Amino acid sequence: MPSLKDLKNRIASVKATQKITKAMKMVAAAKLRRAQEAAEAARPYSQRMGAVLANIAKAVTDADGAPTLMTGTGQDQVHLLVVCTAERGLCGGFNSQIARFAREHVRKLVAEGKTVKIFTVGKKGYDILRREFASLIIERKELRDVKRVGFENADQIGKRIIEMYAAGEFDVCTLFYSEFKSVISQIPTAQRLIPASAEAVQAEDAEHAGAVYEYEPDPASILEDLIPRNISVQIFRALLENVAGEMGAKMSAMDNATRNAGEMINKLTLSYNRQRQAQITKELIEIISGAEAL
């Protein structure tokens, strides 16, 4: 049984930890609001960018004139997975959730006989995936020193991916990130970047249903410029979604840690009081017994 001094030290230690987790929760809550606003503001832009690409792609009648970033290499053998996670931990299962989702995708592709390459964005994703797929990780990018994620960070990653594609290092590129839904809900998401998806987007409003568009100089040239920009935009959105998800998960994790610390303090305090009471009772019995002996 621990002594009163040990219990007192443990209570003081847990209280100190509780102060830290409470402060981290408040910091995460403050950052979450800004991160959530940024992520929600980026969604319409990235979605509309995809819609514009889809509309222009429909106007490209000559498949030979379309950019290779849209048409692809004609093969489906080498896959590059860009896995975006956080730089730091203490955010519950946020990082492991994305890594698990990517890991399942890797295993599926390998089972199909595909060649898989991994590009990690964020230290935690690299740390988790290298345990099983160290030989598959060909590129890593850390944003630890970045105080606030900006478009330039996403653009650097996008340009590097395009360089690798131009060098013939892969055929298909898929982006993995966590879409922010709420403080307690972040959904692992996979989005194909290359070849650029020309899937139909939501139907246009009735007032634009019969619109006829003219492209200058021509649709293929516009796509040549727009697709690389779209890749960076989609990566930027993924990074913003990740930041919001990380802050939400961290706030939830620190809230749980603070409450658990409170419960532990109550239990330790109860044990301390009971042991102290027993000790006082024992001392009183000894005093009374001594007095009676006299």
UniProtKB/Swiss-Prot annotation:
CDD domains: F1-ATPase_gamma (cd12151)
One Pfam family from the record: ATP-synt
Descriptive protein name: ATP synthase gamma chain
Compartments in which it is found: Cell inner membrane
Gene (name only): atpG
InterPro entries listed in its UniProt record: ATP_synth_F1_ATPase_gsu, ATP_synth_F1_gsu, ATP_synth_F1_gsu_CS
Chief place of localization: membrane
Classification via PROSITE patterns: ATPASE_GAMMA
Recorded GO MF terms: ATP binding; proton-transporting ATP synthase activity, rotational mechanism
Keywords assigned: ATP synthesis, Cell inner membrane, Cell membrane, CF(1), Hydrogen ion transport, Ion transport, Membrane, Transport
A single GO BP: proton motive force-driven plasma membrane ATP synthesis
Gene3D superfamilies in the record: 3.40.1380.10, ATP synthase, gamma subunit, helix hairpin domain
GO cellular component, one term: plasma membrane
Membrane topology type: Peripheral membrane protein
Subunit structure: F-type ATPases have 2 components, CF(1) - the catalytic core - and CF(0) - the membrane proton channel. CF(1) has five subunits: alpha(3), beta(3), gamma(1), delta(1), epsilon(1). CF(0) has three main subunits: a, b and c.
